C-alpha cells in the first residue's frame, strides 16, 4: 500500500512540475472570423501575440484589466499585437447573436476578434477547460507560451504579465 501511495505522490509531483513548464511548439490554428469564414490567427509567427480567449458568458471577467491593457497600450508595439477569440462552443447564447454583437463592437473600435466554434484553440494549445473562463495568453512569434492566466486574474498575475510583456514589446 505504501508503494502505491508513494508512486501516486511521485506521479502527481511529476505532473505538477511539467504543468509549470512553458508550452512550446504551439501551432497556428484555423478558426472563424465574425462572418463565419475560415481565418488563421493574425500575426502568428510574425509578431508576439496577446490573445484574449473569452467565454462570452463571462465576458466581463477581467474587464477592468483588459481595459487597462488597452488604455496603456500593453498589447501594442513594434513586436506585439493583440486580438480576441470568442469561445463559442461553451457559450449558452446563440453563436449568431454573439457574432452580431461582436461585429458591431469591432466596427467601432477596430479590434480583431475571431470565433472558436469547436474549442480548436483550447485543444490545440492544451488549455484545458475554458468554460466560464477569461484566458489571457502571450505567445512568442516562435510559438512559446510566455504567459497565461485563466479565470479571475490576481494582482500577482497582473504584475507578472507586465513584467513579461514589457520584454517583448
Q: Each predicted region: which residue ranges?
A:
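Cleaved targeting-peptide boundary
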Residues: 20-26
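A short beta-strand-turn-helix
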Residues: 29-48
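Short active-site neighborhood of thiol/selenol oxidoreductases, capturing the structured segment around
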Residues: 42-65
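Structural microenvironment flanking redox-active thiols in thiol-disulfide oxidoreductases
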Residues: 59-106
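Thiol-/selenol-based redox modules, centered on thioredoxin-like
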Residues: 132-169
Amino acid at each position: 500500500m505504501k508503494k502505491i501511495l508513494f508512486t501516486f505522490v511521485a506521479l502527481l509531483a511529476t505532473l505538477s512540475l511539467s504543468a509549470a513548464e512553458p508550452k512550446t511548439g504551439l501551432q497556428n490554428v484555423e478558426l472563424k472570423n465574425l462572418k463565419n469564414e475560415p481565418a488563421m490567427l493574425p500575426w502568428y509567427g510574425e509578431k508576439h501575440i496577446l490573445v484574449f480567449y473569452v467565454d462570452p458568458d463571462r465576458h466581463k471577467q477581467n474587464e477592468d484589466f483588459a481595459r487597462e491593457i488597452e488604455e496603456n497600450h500593453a498589447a501594442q508595439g513594434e513586436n506585439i499585437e493583440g486580438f480576441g477569440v470568442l469561445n463559442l462552443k461553451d457559450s449558452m447564447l446563440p453563436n449568431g447573436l454573439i457574432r452580431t454583437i461582436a461585429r458591431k463592437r469591432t466596427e467601432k473600435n477596430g479590434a480583431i476578434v475571431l470565433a472558436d466554434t469547436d474549442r480548436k484553440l483550447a485543444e490545440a494549445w492544451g488549455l484545458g477547460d475554458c468554460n466560464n473562463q477569461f484566458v489571457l495568453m502571450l505567445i512568442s512569434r516562435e510559438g512559446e507560451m510566455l504567459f497565461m492566466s485563466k479565470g479571475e486574474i490576481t494582482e500577482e498575475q497582473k504584475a507578472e504579465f507586465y513584467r513579461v510583456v514589457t520584454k517583448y514589446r
